[in-house]
Amino acid sequence: MANRPLDILNNALDTPVIVRLKGAREFRGELKGYDIHMNLVLDNAEELREGEVVSKFGSVVIRGDNVVYVSP
């Protein structure tokens, strides 16, 4: 049973997630990796504004202290 945040991230590996950042930025992509600081690696990442895609990226690394939430 996944009770800790890192357990939930582990269960979300290789699946699409939405990541909300400080400053109202949002990314959607496939979670490929993370560490204990909640630094995240997303593949096929897209930046969203108001639910619309504004930029597409191959892979992105998101610094954990900017993450507000991760939605699997």
UniProtKB/Swiss-Prot annotation:
SUPFAM superfamilies: Sm-like ribonucleoproteins (SSF50182). Residues 4-72 form the Sm domain. It holds the Pfam family LSM. Gene3D superfamilies: 2.30.30.100. SMART domains: Sm. InterPro entries: Lsm7/SmG-like, LSM_dom_sf, Sm, Sm_dom_euk/arc, snRNP_Sm-like_arc. GO terms for molecular function: RNA binding. This is Putative snRNP Sm-like protein.
